[in-house]
Amino acid sequence: MDFQHRPGGKTGSGGVASSSESNRDRRERLRQLALETIDINKDPYFMKNHLGSYECKLCLTLHNNEGSYLAHTQGKKHQTNLARRAAKEAKEAPAQPAPEKVKVEVKKFVKIGRPGYKVTKQRDTEMGQQSLLFQIDYPEIAEGIMPRHRFMSAYEQRIEPPDRRWQYLLMAAEPYETIAFKVPSREIDKAEGKFWTHWNRETKQFFLQFHFKMEKPPAPPSLPAGPPGVKRPPPPLMNGLPPRPPLPESLPPPPPGGLPLPPMPPSGPAPSGPPGPPQLPPPAPGVHPPAPVVHPPASGVHPPAPGVHPPAPGVHPPAPVVHPPASGVHPPAPGVHPPAPGVHPPAPGVHPPAPGVHPPPSAGVHPQAPVVHPPAPAVHPQAPGVHPTPAVHPQAPGVHPPAPGVHPPAPGIHPQPPGVHPPPPGVHPPAPGVHPQPPGVHPSNPGVHPPTPMPPMLRPPLPSEGPGNIPPPPPTN
């Protein structure tokens, strides 16, 4: 027989197992599983004979291996024989007598009533511990009987509804009825000297005394300590008034020189809202600001304000390039701020000061306080409420300012075009770039900004410029 080329075979695998080999392997697996759950050695009907086979003494069957016997024990025949054997043994077994119960003999006697009693409440003078003293009279107690006692809870008795606040102390002695005393349900102190009983055989009196344990007084409730950094709630109000705020740890040192103490900071919450404008410190006590001294102008020339230095003679800054707008409203000169609200322009007919000469301070305007910082270098301060005007030489009517990119003449040299005469003496020319206006017309309204000058390419030509001054149009591609 060819064992190498059988169908389904694989070289080196030993060939395909036959059906008998598969059954043998299956039975061995089942036997191993049965041995894990059933101990064959403890089976009273399992027996191995001298031939090496296995027998069932209950069913008288023969088995070649352990697996066969285990399969037999789970079969119907073996289970039926087990039930029949159990019924037979139960029928033949003798009936065993039931165990006798221990019987307690109940004493039978005629009750003659309740005994007399006396209860005394006591308190320890040193510790304040409470106690009860019971005295029970048994004059007709039976011979050889000693009174007995016990504590009973409220749930053991059947006379009253159970109440956990009370307990009962029972006293019993023949032939008297059992009596009970209702006491508070507190822990009993059974230490030596705190709980004792005494039976006097001569007087036939029974004494019992016990003490209640001391109850610790409840501690005052204390606020729990919160985590660090968390403040405790404020104390309650006393008489409807909040407690005083804590005093500061240290007061600020007194100022030197005997000056008055600064005001204390307010203890209430800080006021909310935007901060106000900065205020100047008040003048020292007893010092009044000097009154303004106004001198009359001499021959149309206004003197400068006190403390103001005039510019150096012969130094004139270049005139700025200002294009007059097309409308009839002229902007102020460069560097000249429009008047603040509430400050009116000069009345008509009042001439501005000459170049380089500063106007006097207005009447009713106080000079600056000594705490005002000095002006920046090369800037001359003016009286309060009056804005400075740059010292610019006026130009004759019809003379245009230099174009952008053209350097001004050197300081001290003032070229004049031919045919233009300087103004007569005593007549003050207007500021550069500012055209005189008729009386009753204000130079600018407070709070109204001048219009932005238009570039030369967009504004219309002025009559003074003439057709020759119009810039050429931009080249086209």
Curated annotation (Swiss-Prot):
| Any GO CC annotation of this UniProt entry | catalytic step 2 spliceosome
Residues recorded as bearing Phosphoserine in the entry: 153
GO BP: mRNA splicing, via spliceosome; spliceosomal complex assembly; U2-type prespliceosome assembly
Q: What does this protein do?
A: Component of the 17S U2 SnRNP complex of the spliceosome, a large ribonucleoprotein complex that removes introns from transcribed pre-mRNAs. The 17S U2 SnRNP complex (1) directly participates in early spliceosome assembly and (2) mediates recognition of the intron branch site during pre-mRNA splicing by promoting the selection of the pre-mRNA branch-site adenosine, the nucleophile for the first step of splicing.
Comp. bias regions, Pro residues? 217-295, 303-323, 331-362, 399-441, 448-477
Q: Which gene encodes it?
A: SF3A2
Pfam families the UniProt entry points to? SF3A2 (PF16835), zf-met (PF12874)
Q: Which residues carry this modification: N6-acetyllysine?
A: 10
State the residue spans of region: Disordered. Answer: 1-27, 217-477
Q: What is this protein called?
A: Splicing factor 3A subunit 2
Which sequence ranges does the entry mark as zinc finger (Matrin-type)?
A: 54-84
